[in-house]
């Protein structure tokens, strides 16, 4: 499963493995709602997308979980019981073609654990 390899690479902080699972023309789009730091424009290419994802996953105290995101496999990043990011993925073959990254705290409430 592509998303599981993506999650494992993120969890290890392995930029080489992370880049290998991203398609050459991968696009990453963030929704920060202007409430938290995040890129305003879509990111294009393995290097830009890998840099953002690596930054998110390296935050202190963040745990990763592979979960269903909009009916597809994705990642939920939590600090304790609170979701800090949800990453939806669209795959093409054995690579990730598109990532949708929700950082907007107003949209993460349903992902918190009680």
What is the predicted function of each stretch?
Residues 1-114:
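C-terminal and inter-domain tail/linker signature
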